[in-house]
Amino acid sequence: MMKELIPLSARFTEALRGAADLHARQVRKGTKIPYIAHLLGVASIALHHGADEDEAIAALLHDTIEDAPRELGANWVQNWLRFRFGERVLEIVEGCTDADVSSKPSWRRRKESYIAGLPKEPSSVLLVSASDKLHNASAVLSDYREIGNRVWARFDKEAGKDGTIGYYRGLVTAYQRTSKHPRLIRELDAVVAQIEVEAGHLGVWPLPR
């Protein structure tokens, strides 16, 4: 059931400005697309699936802890999120962050830990997280159609084609187990399935060791 419409306030506008400032010098991997395009896409998907204002703000800011300029530091970003937007927005953003940026483990360990933790996350985190993954997976599919297997070089060397597709399949399975946001998860599942078909590779998670 869709939530009652809540008009977006000046807080959302402030979050949009903050996202634009914090990610101003960043582009999407392997492209010249400004990173803000991804953040707007995630917020749009979340709103389409019933996000309230806190969830929409968290969608805009979901990458700030991991990807804000290093000179600011994760602690500064967390304090800024808490002071400007409140504890709930901070908690959603933290729930969407897949690693402690002060001691970032390997790609495999980060992704295994993230997927394992999803069933314990509240509905708001799952909404923003799945919106992020749907936007990312849709970009992977679009880019694969344009440049073929070269797209996998944009990802962590430890991931490659097998790891990337396997990770998305593992995400879908984890989201499905929560029984939250079923329409959103069906959309993600459909995109991941299409990647598997077109790339000729069924995703397997966890990855073989």
Regions of interest found by a model, annotated:
Residues 1-209:
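Active-site helical microenvironments for divalent-metal-assisted chemistry
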